[in-house]
Amino acid sequence: MDAKRLTHLQQLEAESIHIIREVAAEFDNPVMMYSIGKDSSVMLHLARKAFYPGKIPFPLLHVDTDWKFKEMIEFRDKTAEKYGFDLLVHKNPEGLEMGINPFVHGSSKHTDIMKTQGLKQALNKYGFDAAFGGARRDEEKSRAKERVYSFRDKNHTWDPKNQRPELWNTYNGQVNKGESIRVFPLSNWTELDIWQYIYLENIEIVPLYLSEKRPVVERDGMLIMVDDERLKLEEGEEIQHKDIRFRTLGCYPLTGAVESKANTLPEIIEEMLVATSSERQGRAIDHDSSGSMELKKRQGYF
């Protein structure tokens, strides 16, 4: 097909499918990270397209912190059963034994132990040499400077000053034993692109992205949804019921909702057309300290 005749979304789709197929052909043991969010749902859809009518030739991995929204876990299990892909779920056993949680230990320690260390454990356990992630360059400044093929050393760390050149659609996947590549097929997509593609392709998403009246508390400048009994009210707090939705999904105590009436995909797209901030402003882990996301990525975070 003539690239000049492709629409913007068709070009993005073709680029992403090309990257997914390249990794499947080039690496011995790839895996696709599955965080259950909108970007993961798009990436899963692209992987299914890339190998249709065959099955996805690599497993999907979810690093579970034990603090995800209940609706996310329900959606994860339902999706895995529906499409029949190989789903691996890993929880950091040491973190669970220590009782690590975001309320007692804070977002930074919780994220490091349950997410970063948990991810590195899983990658080492299964010996994956390439891992797909759904990060996009428009999300956050440290992600904006990361390559599509992001080299990681034997400790899974990232050095932004030691990245490989990428000329057009040519990628260097050469690694030594123990080294790996993080691969970001959605690098050139924007949040608006994601939502338009979800709408056009009729991709299923977690209902939390759609507005509904939900119980929340206002804490540290964020609207935190009361998802289970583990959220204890602090002095002066009270549960309110507001029309909210989420632009990004993570551990529920660390993910802020936005007040919104948008409960259909066209309404979400209308909101995105006038949005002036990144969806990651609702993630507490991005505000631990100046440059906190880049520091986390250097340590092995996605």
UniProtKB/Swiss-Prot annotation:
- The EC class name is transferase
Stated name of the protein:
Sulfate adenylyltransferase subunit 2
Q: Does the keyword DNA damage apply?
A: no
Origin species, per record, is Aliivibrio fischeri (strain ATCC 700601 / ES114) (Vibrio fischeri)
Q: Which NCBIfam families match?
A: CysD, PRK05253.1, PRK12563.1
**Which family does the similarity line name?**
Belongs to the PAPS reductase family. CysD subfamily.
Q: Which cysteines are joined by disulfide bonds?
A: none
Keyword list (alphabetical) reads: ATP-binding, Nucleotide-binding, Nucleotidyltransferase, Transferase
Read off the InterPro entries from this record. PAPS_reduct_dom, Rossmann-like_a/b/a_fold, SO4_adenylTrfase_ssu, Sulfate_adenylyltrnsfr_sub2
Q: State if ATP-binding is listed as a keyword.
A: yes
Q: Where is the composition biased (Basic and acidic residues)?
A: 280-302
Tell me the function of this protein.
With CysN forms the ATP sulfurylase (ATPS) that catalyzes the adenylation of sulfate producing adenosine 5'-phosphosulfate (APS) and diphosphate, the first enzymatic step in sulfur assimilation pathway. APS synthesis involves the formation of a high-energy phosphoric-sulfuric acid anhydride bond driven by GTP hydrolysis by CysN coupled to ATP hydrolysis by CysD.
